[in-house]
């Protein structure tokens, strides 16, 4: 025997063990004869603690528990819908709907009504291999109102494919059609209720909440869905979550329950959270809110789940207005014409009893006090609008429209025939009709896409006790705000419930503890920014070409800094370079014109042109220092200028050495001097120095790169300094060191030859040039070690131009002066006389 067969066998045993139905004459609140019967399961009396009475095979007596006004209101809605359909000529014409309704005591009485509905008129449920031709006494069941009961009943009805349309059970478990193939509902699932709550809290910027749940499946499942939803977003944090004690029916609060309530309220008093979300049946909240009043809580926001959001009994505790603002999620408000009068109508409808139907009663089909108690709450129920009532009303109409299709009804009559539950179930999935302006149908999960309302409790005499303030659409998953909220706070201000206040723009969140909603705000430092859509807890660094100030939410492009033409230093240096170029060109022409004269020969002859040409080229290449650096300009700075300068220095140095050799070494070391001159020692020296310099420069460039880069100005991060690669500075320092060595050598040789004939005594001119070169190079090295940025470029350019000017004017200037203004001294006779005078002084 399989598990399903064993379950059915157990159900049959239970059916025969339970009390037998009793024959009843006439109609009542719980019975109405008809051609097709609907079963109705409602909570008229509530026992929130499910006690298993099956252990001693007795059905609980529901009227021993507290009456639930809303439950009777919903039962009246089913009666009203059936009576309205029976009086309608366009829907099921000529067909009478009947009903059998049972009080399920919330949780205590679920199995017996399910078996009762499945049995036949003679209280018989046969064991068959095929139930496709089996006719239980009802074709569909409306209810019950809570998820636990709905699941219990569905586990029974699903074996027989009896359609079950619940009007208030929101658990997501019912969406599993493999487990609950016959379950449908006219209310959105718990996921949508939770989403509406979360969007409400996000709208009012409440990110620090307390969650209170009942100790049952309803509380646990909904709190789990809420926690899961909040974990996915991280926008809202739960300060703490507690379980509310479930009271025994008709019993005083036990000491352990009182201690549990006191502990919850003490934590609630000490927390900074001011928003409390409660998932619990309303009967579990009476003791809790009485304690809330006793503790004098004020300024809280209480968010109600659908199970107690529109409960008139809790609302009747008018002192609750002093504890804060009550908000709740419930089904949309749809006014049902005529229902408010029907709810408290005492007369019973009279219809002819079909011949094949014999009425009977079963347990928990009585509620003597229901009408009187409901009358006392009629004003609240009428003003609140028919919310869950419409869910019952639409469920009955969904079954009626399905029967209308199955019976092939036209405008005047229907074809009465046997309707099996599985036929009704198959057809009800395709039903689509308009009821009181709403288009109703079931989606693939069996849910009817009804709107949800966010309501606020009001206590004014003329006010709607459950005023709608917002609407939520399950299809769009969006909350639409339709009115303002009357906050029970000073100056009607929105209550604040935040672990930490929102950070200002440009401030990141530094978590405190385990909750992401608890943090301190830290300013994003310069060079970083905060993009909240990407990461609220870390400041992001700006790209290299961009910058930001403190507390910025975006980066901006930095200003590029380089040597520009319109700047004063550039203009001054350019003028000096132009003068140098012109003067060098003039010297070149003068020396070319007087190439055969003793003055030009004593200055070095052909070697003079070896100096003047690099000088001329160097002055002409000065513009490469101006403008954004490029690979070519960096190459010129690092290679061209330093090679030209080294050629000039090496020529001056070797020229000083050669003059000393002529007058000092020729007599003492004639063979060495002869070797020096025979193998063109001066040119070899210049070529060697040039080759060494070229090798150093090439090695430096190959080791790194000469590409220009942008670097942050240390004095102003908003500026990017465009310059050559930092290696350029290292190479410049190294090359300058070599030039300093040549300057020292040239100065030394010039000093040794200070006693030579006047025409050959170039000590003071070379000393001037070398001293200037030495001083400027030292200054440049010192400046580069201290400063950075465009100033280094300006200083480098200025030193380069001045060094070339010092060589050009310091070395060649006096000679041009003598050639142009003292031509009598530029003769061989004059030079010979000076040499003879020097020889006579030394002899």
From Swiss-Prot:
Gene3D superfamilies registered for this protein in UniProt: 3.40.50.2300, GPCR, family 3, nine cysteines domain
A GO MF label: sweet taste receptor activity
Tissue: Expressed mainly in circumvallate and foliate taste papillae.
InterPro entries the UniProt entry points to: ANF_lig-bd_rcpt, GPCR_3, GPCR_3_9-Cys_dom, GPCR_3_9-Cys_sf, GPCR_3_C, GPCR_3_Ca_sens_rcpt-rel, GPCR_3_CS, Peripla_BP_I
Record localization: Cell membrane
Annotated consequence of substituting residue 352 to R: In strain: DBA/2J
Extracellular side: 20-570, 628-642, 704-731, 786-789
Main location: membrane
Stretch forming the signal peptide: 1-19
Bilayer-crossing regions: 571-591, 607-627, 643-663, 683-703, 732-752, 765-785, 790-810
Key words of the record: Cell membrane, G-protein coupled receptor, Glycoprotein, Membrane, Receptor, Sensory transduction, Signal, Taste, Transducer, Transmembrane, Transmembrane helix
Carbohydrate-modified residues: 87, 296, 316, 355, 372, 432, 484, 491, 531
GO terms for biological process, alphabetical: positive regulation of cytokinesis; sensory perception of sweet taste
Membrane topology: Multi-pass membrane protein
Gene Ontology annotations for the cellular component aspect, listed alphabetically: plasma membrane; receptor complex; sweet taste receptor complex
Topology feature Cytoplasmic, residues: 592-606, 664-682, 753-764, 811-843
Complex formation: Forms heterodimers with TAS1R3.
Role according to the record: Putative taste receptor. TAS1R2/TAS1R3 recognizes diverse natural and synthetic sweeteners.
Family the entry assigns: Belongs to the G-protein coupled receptor 3 family. TAS1R subfamily.
Protein name (Swiss-Prot/TrEMBL): Taste receptor type 1 member 2
Organism: Mus musculus
